[in-house]
Curated annotation (Swiss-Prot):
SUPFAM superfamilies: Scorpion toxin-like. It comes from Centruroides limpidus. Beta toxins bind voltage-independently at site-4 of sodium channels (Nav) and shift the voltage of activation toward more negative potentials thereby affecting sodium channel activation and promoting spontaneous and repetitive firing. Has the structural arrangement of an alpha-helix connected to antiparallel beta-sheets by disulfide bonds (CS-alpha/beta). Residues 1-66 form the LCN-type CS-alpha/beta domain. Disulfide bonds join C12-C65, C16-C41, C25-C46, C29-C48. This is Beta-toxin Cll1m.
């Protein structure tokens, strides 16, 4: 599974500005989804890869970014 890492309290994606390989996104993806996750900056949001199937990613149902 892949997807944008999401802030569960705000419903917003984690923003990034350095597209492609991005240490911040990689670190955040691993922190939220585990050591096996990968991450990079895509379309100014942190995109996480190699997630477990039940991982919660953006957009959150019934919660828009505030």
């Amino acid at each position: 599974k892949e997807g944008y890492i999401v802030n569960l309290s705000t419903g917003c994606k984690y923003e990034c500005y350095k597209l492609g390989d991005n240490d911040y996104c990689l670190r955040e993806c691993k922190q939220q989804y585990g050591k096996g996750a990968g991450g990079y900056c895509y379309a100014f949001g942190c995109w996480c890869t190699h997630l477990y199937e039940q991982a919660v990613v953006w957009p959150l149902p019934k919660k828009t970014c505030t």
